[in-house]
A protein has these predicted regions:
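Active-site neighborhood of HAD-like aspartate-dependent phosphohydrolases
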Residues: 1-43, 55-57
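Conserved Lys-Pro-Asp/Glu-containing loop-to-beta segment of HAD-superfamily phosphomonoesterases
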Residues: 4, 138-171
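Helix-loop "lid/cap" segments that line or gate small-molecule binding pockets
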Residues: 27, 47-61, 114, 145-147
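Conserved H-loop
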Residues: 34, 59, 121-125, 155, ...
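A short, structured active-site edge motif that brings together acidic residues
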Residues: 39-41, 121-136, 160
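Short, acidic loop-to-helix structural element flanking the phosphoryl-transfer center
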Residues: 76-102, 108-112
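Structural recognition of alpha->loop->beta junctions
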Residues: 119-128, 193-212
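Acidic, Mg2+-coordinating phosphoryl-transfer loop and its flanking beta/alpha structural elements
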Residues: 163-202
Length: 213
């Protein structure tokens, strides 16, 4: 049976790094803190996002809910689009009989809105986001997604499972729920950081799919 792919959304299929840097710098400016460059962001960002904000001088213990709400308000002001090679990769996977779902740390309603806006729902068996704006771990939802795929008969015993993402957290999550991690180097963390995991790193989404086929 052809393998199964679970895709990350933000930074992987969705090109939102510049939007995230814009939103982050709005947060920092509003709090009188120094802004950061895109390169700094990709070299330091990680999950849980709360720890990254502490590194930048914010105080999540005091106003974490406000930080999360403000970040998502600001990121909505910035242009975001699926990556130019995203549909090519999804079509390539479909043509080779690969199953596909999404797992994201984005809140479920926002994830469904964004994937619907880009008319991508038809590619995926399941689209799993989280129930908050925290930018924390998606591991629990990943386990639920795998259980759902198994209950639907889409992930029978022996079918190879891959998780394609763009962060160290994606590699950790994949390993925890039994998938092989594949990382792409265009997202929220640098290629150097990703390579240090020992995972395979692709230069494009179609290249990642070809590693699975």
């Amino acid at each position: 049976m052809a393998p199964y792919i679970i895709w990350d959304w933000n930074g992987t299929l969705l090109d939102d790094v510049d939007a995230a840097v814009y939103a982050l710098n709005r947060l920092l400016s509003e709090r009188g803190l120094p802004t950061v460059t895109r390169d700094f962001y990709r070299a330091h960002f990680g999950f849980p996002a709360r720890n990254f904000y502490i590194e930048l001088g914010m105080d999540p213990d005091r106003d974490w809910e406000r930080i999360c709400v403000d970040f998502h308000r600001h990121i909505a002001e910035a242009p975001q689009a699926i990556r130019p090679d995203a549909v090519e990769a999804l079509e390539l996977a479909r043509a080779h009989g690969l199953g596909q779902s999404i797992l994201s740390a984005l809140r479920q309603d926002l994830l469904l809105r964004d994937t619907g806006r880009d008319r991508l729902h038809g590619y995926f068996d399941e689209i799993y986001g989280v129930d908050n704006l925290d930018g924390a771990s998606k591991l629990a939802r990943g386990r639920q997604l795998v259980a759902q795929l198994r209950s639907r008969g889409l992930l029978p015993e022996g079918r190879a499972l891959y998780f394609i993402g763009d962060t160290l957290h994606d590699a950790e999550v994949a390993t925890e729920f039994g998938a092989t991690p594949l990382l792409v180097d265009h997202g929220h963390q640098t290629a150097e950081r990703l390579a240090a995991t020992g995972c395979r790193v692709a230069e494009s989404l179609p290249a990642a799919v070809r590693m699975v086929i």
